[in-house]
Amino acid sequence: MRILIVEDESHLAETLGQILREQHYQTDIVNDGADGLDYALSGQYDLVLLGVMLPKLDGFEVARRLRAAHISTPVLMLTARDETGDKITGLDCGADDYMTKPFDMGELLARVRALTRRQGEVL
């Protein structure tokens, strides 16, 4: 399974990458929304972990553009924005899940497993 991490906090991105690699996922890390969109549009990923407050292009817009391009890769948003309106916006933009920072790594891994498990299922 291959996961794209789009996160501008480099320490968090590296920590996520390390933990996911320990769980036998392949990871790529990009630090801004424009690069994240380019990578995600390649269709090479089983999951995108997407920050919201990103340079160049925010996570909401990245999710919108992915869905407009008919990219169905699951998207899990990770953000400090914890208002209900932000959660609604994220999900309505096309995210499949939304977690607020700080988050529990065990819960994040469970959500990653749930979203990647759905790959290939017929809904």
List the predicted regions and their residue ranges.
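N-terminal/domain-start alpha-helical segments
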Residues: M1-V122
